[in-house]
UniProtKB/Swiss-Prot annotation:
Similarity comment: family membership: Belongs to the UPF0538 family.
InterPro entries reported for this sequence: UPF0538 (IPR018794)
Name of protein: UPF0538 protein C2orf76 homolog
A Pfam cross-reference name: DUF2340
Length: 126
């Protein structure tokens, strides 16, 4: 079976409150790899991207959540939608494809603790 590859946009979220994020496009992502393998890849790749400012490169990202899938509705949230965590948060033991990721999917990469704190009190600082 040939590896199914996709183009994904990963939104690195540094701060929910300050709406501090940056999208990074990845081409040729194997959708048959597990979410955990993709997280490991991102943790190795992000610090090496000199085009990103140091606060984004050196942050403790650990969680992936689907933001938007091609040809489907987008959320009104500017940084990340707070709903549907049970279906949109990616579980590490599943493959990207089994998690609903397809070509042109936009995924958020963030610190899970920050997300829980923001979800409990979703107030922006500006």
């Amino acid at each position: 079976m040939a590896a199914e590859e996709a183009t994904l946009t990963v939104r690195l979220i540094r701060s929910f409150e300050h709406r501090n994020f940056k999208p990074v496009v990845y081409h040729g992502v194997n959708l048959h790899q597990t979410v955990k393998e993709f997280i490991i890849f991102l943790k190795q790749d992000v610090p090496l991207r000199t085009s990103l400012p140091p606060p984004l490169r050196n942050y403790k990202y650990d969680t992936l959540k689907i933001l938007h899938q091609a040809h489907k509705a987008k959320t009104n949230e500017l940084v990340l939608g707070l709903e549907d965590d049970d279906t949109l948060l990616l579980k590490e033991d599943r493959t990207l494809k089994d998690s609903g990721v397809a070509s042109e999917t936009e995924i958020a990469f963030f610190c899970g603790e920050d997300y829980k704190r923001y979800k409990a009190n979703p107030i922006s600082s500006w």
